[in-house]
Each structure stands twice: as structure tokens, then as C-alpha cells.
Amino acid sequence: MEPETEGPPPTIQVTPLQQMMASCAGAVVTSLMVTPLDVVKIRLQAQNNPFPKGKCFLYSNGLMDHICICEEESKKAWYKKPGNFHGTLDAFLKIVRNEGIKSLWSGLPPTLVMAVPATVIYFTCYEQLSTFLKTKLGENETRIPIVAGIVARFGAVTMISPLELIRTKMQSKTFSYKELYQIVSMKVSEDGWISLWKGWAPTILRDVPFSAMYWYNYENLRRWLCEKSDLYESTFMINFTAGALSGSFAAVATLPFDVVKTQKQTQLWTHEYCKFPEPLDMSTWSIMKNIVADRGFSGLFTGLIPRLVKIVPACAIMISSYELGKGFFQQQNVESR
């Protein structure tokens, strides 16, 4: 009598609440690990080209890019502190030594109010959609990560965009809830409800293709690495590696949309803050044509290395932390049976 072949262990599902908790923990870990890289980059930029009042710049906490408006003429703002840095490593060391290690996370708390909920919505929606589609199409259907990634990212960006707009407006002044309501009401009455989603289109154009490519490559790379390692369940290193590689592929492929998004959003907010009339044509296609005309096709791939330095560790840390959290809850669910 032949021995029975051992199959994969049954998959222990985690609840939506547990998925939310795992993604929340992963989001916090990612932001704590990645934010110092962007803080140092911004400090170096401000040292070489000081930000004038009304200047917009991007701040990334590893989860989202946030538009920040330079409000203060003095050197009180964290990005205007003098440093006399000579390179990235020197900036790290001098900031820690002269200002304290907490300065590496300057500006982080206000952005987490948006970034953590967005990440929780995104990952939980992806998991729920994937589970639902697998029951309809089968476990090995390759289109599932693409569809789930597109829908989840579209929903997360759409839900968070109005809140991010409000956060950007509140940078210059602390508003009461009543004042905030009046500002939003005035904005809606002047420009309509659609005005609350200013900057939504370029974000969708970059993030939705990124999400589709990322999840498709991640799920397939993880499965392939497990097969090569003769494992049924992925390890922390497999998740980390698959996340890093998938993030790098998606970052390169969507770089032109990132260049357009950055330029469009900074122009929009600079014009709004300085009360300049907006250019008549700020469509994505128009901005792309202007970039190609000024700098050639290579202009659409400006900033590839900085984008990879930001995206690759963020994707690797986020997905491996998230899967680690899910594994913890799966173990808890097994023990509670």
C-alpha cells in the first residue's frame, strides 16, 4: 500500500478586522523605517535650493506622497533648519547629533492621519476582493491580483483625496471644526463637489497601474519562490524579496506618470496658494508633451534612482510586515479553535 502524499496544510483565514490591524501595524513600521530617507533628501534639497514662501514640495512617508507648502519665512520650519551637509550620510549623522534622532521623523505625524487609513483601506479591500474572486474564478486565476489591485487602489485614492486636500489647506493655520466646515462649504459652492478631488486624476493614473503590476508580480513571484524553496507557505524573506522586486518593476514602468503627477500637483497648489490664475491646459497629455518638448523622452524618466530608493524598501517592508501580522493572527486563530 502506497503512503499518502502530504498536501499543503489548510489555509487559516484571518478576519477583516485582523487584516486591518496587520495593515495598520505594517503602515506604521514602514513609515518609521522609510521617512528618514525622505527627510534627509528634503533637507539636502532645501540646503542647495532654499524653499521660498509658497513653494510646494513632496513629502513621502513611504505610504503616500503628500504636498507640503512652504509657509514660513523664518528658519523655524524643520525643512529650513541650517545644516551645512556634505552628502546623505553626513546629513544623517549631523541631524541626529545636532538636532536629536527625532528630527529624522520631522513632519511625519500629520501625514500619518491620511496615510495609515488609506493603507488599511487599500490592503483590506485587496484581501477581501481576492478572497471573493478566488471563490468565483478559482485559486490559480492569474487575473485576480490585477483586478483586485485596480479596484482596491481606485477606492482608497477616491476616499482619501478630499481629506488630503483639506490637510494641505490646513498647513498654514489651525482651524476649528466650524472654520473647517466653512472652508469646505465655500470650496464646494464656488467650484462644485468635484473640487474636493483636485489632484485625483494624476494620482489615479499613476497608482492604479502601479497597483495592478505590483500585486500581479508579487503574487506570482512569491508563488515561484515558494516552489523553488519547496515550501507551502512563504517566509518573511520570500515576502520581502517578492515585495522589493515587484515594487521596483512597477516603479520603473509607472515613472512617467509619477513625473507628470508631481509636476501637476505642485503647479496646482503653487497657483492656488499664490492666487495665480491656473494655466488653461493642465491635462496629463499636455504636461507630458511639454516635458518631452523641453527635455526629450528622457525627461519622463527623471528621478528614477530616487524613486527606486523610496519605493523598493517601502514595498518590501510594508508587505513583509503585513504578511508577518497576518501570520501572527492565523496562529492565534489556530490556537483558539
Swiss-Prot record:
Cellular compartments annotated: Mitochondrion inner membrane
Topology versus the membrane: Multi-pass membrane protein
Cellular component per GO, a single term: mitochondrion
Keywords: Membrane, Mitochondrion, Mitochondrion inner membrane, Repeat, Transmembrane, Transmembrane helix, Transport
Solcar repeat copies, ranges: 14-132, 140-224, 234-328
Gene3D superfamilies for the chain: Mitochondrial carrier domain
Known function: Probable mitochondrial transporter required for glutathione import into mitochondria. Glutathione, which plays key roles in oxidative metabolism, is produced exclusively in the cytosol and is imported in many organelles. Mitochondrial glutathione is required for the activity and stability of proteins containing iron-sulfur clusters, as well as erythropoiesis.
Family of the protein in this entry: Belongs to the mitochondrial carrier (TC 2.A.29) family.
Protein name as annotated: Mitochondrial glutathione transporter SLC25A40
Native species: Rattus norvegicus
Lineage, opening ranks: Eukaryota, Metazoa, Chordata, Craniata, Vertebrata
